[in-house]
């Protein structure tokens, strides 16, 4: 016997279903549920008088059951915007589908059986995304990691050794000894970490040593001398060991111009940091490189999106980060050459066109580690307001744009750095790094951060209260952030050479090491929803940017969503 209920009543009980729409926080972005895995009438819910009870939604006889199920969640990922249950076992995602007890419920996936051994997170009215990946971290201060977690980022890739002058400017962990110490320090934090060695060397020995010591990639930075010889050698060694190379090119064109760098790269895969150039790179035309098929381009978040305040804040920021002296005219000229309104405006549009593929932070070194997710969605909102619907979207929803932008900080950095077999999306077999958001707080303040299948970070109330919700509600570490659970639910990414040599055992690491792979074969075409390769041109006098002949320009935003109203307390 069927019972028909109003759509609004159904949404109130179980969350939105196929065809329902919702707004993402206070943005102009609207999503529409494309598919619902539920079998209507057999939804699985937990609580007093609810479904997940022994012999009802919980199987009495099954032994091979889930460790954790997230029920009736709205899932946003590069592959779709759907509603369903997420099954997790042994810290890994089983799949998205219909969970429950197949003995009493219709449509239950045999891999998603709920039993007495299953924990539950109620996902009704919640959005779930894959844990974010920040691929441009200066490891200056450990305090960056709680900030990143509090914005939904669970994987950090970069370099450094703490607040050393070199680390404040460059994303490198140089040398075998420094690499070992940072790998050991990684054991203290409930996130996945990977470290880039210093790539600036014209001879191979030091580069090989760093890779064998555990570097998951190499970083070329202009402050160490990103010459054509260093670029060529770094890429040659990376090709040999299958690790990624990230590059910050020569702003002052001292060792060569953009064309010289392109010749040195010679068609080999490379991740270009802050591709627009305000964060560094050949002035004024480094942005042209985003159109190359072998370039994996990213932005850092201070220029995301272009606003009336963007230019004003950058000069002092740059002087501090690159150890420049405001009393030296050449240092001031160096800084001023990098800050160009025209290319920053074009950067907004190149993101919307899917030309620039990733967004990262540049943490404490011209970037804010706790704002990667927020600034990504601010950029998407600004482009919706200024440019209208994307091709494939409609007046009903912005699903295509939402998929494009979420890929910029999830699957695409995972693909670029050879870790997509472990993280970056909500797909079977991947580490269960999941972020739960209330829709009204999407992109700003997550509710729950699940790390490797266990809650590691949470917006939690007073621990002495009678219930979990009383103020002050603060982001606090949960049990997944302590003891042996931390090492069992997070990974340290290293080169295959280091992994195979047993670097974890050599250094007595508590976290499992995971080898990066496929770093040298990935191309721009492999990056999801963000693989356009137009011919980009920059006028050397006006800095005007064109893609396939079309002028790329937009007005700076005077106000943004996901801003002050969310940070009153």
Swiss-Prot record:
Task: Give the binding site residues for Ni(2+) 2.
Answer: 219, 248, 274
Per the record, the pathway is: Nitrogen metabolism; urea degradation; CO(2) and NH(3) from urea (urease route): step 1/1
Q: Which GO terms describe its molecular function?
A: nickel cation binding; urease activity
Q: How this protein is processed and modified after translation, per its record? A: Carboxylation allows a single lysine to coordinate two nickel ions.
Q: Which domain of life is it from?
A: Bacteria
Q: Where does substrate bind?
A: 221
Urease domain boundaries: 131-569
Instruction: Please name the catalytic residues of this protein.
Output: 322
List S-S links within the chain.
none
Q: Which GO terms describe its cellular component?
A: cytoplasm
Q: Which GO terms describe its biological process?
A: urea catabolic process
Q: What are the alphabetically sorted keywords of the record?
A: Cytoplasm, Hydrolase, Metal-binding, Nickel
Q: Which EC number(s) are documented for this chain?
A: 3.5.1.5
Q: Its principal location?
A: cytoplasm
Q: How is the cofactor bound?
A: Binds 2 nickel ions per subunit.
So what family is this one in?
Belongs to the metallo-dependent hydrolases superfamily. Urease alpha subunit family.
Protein name (database record): Urease subunit alpha
Q: Which gene encodes it?
A: ureC
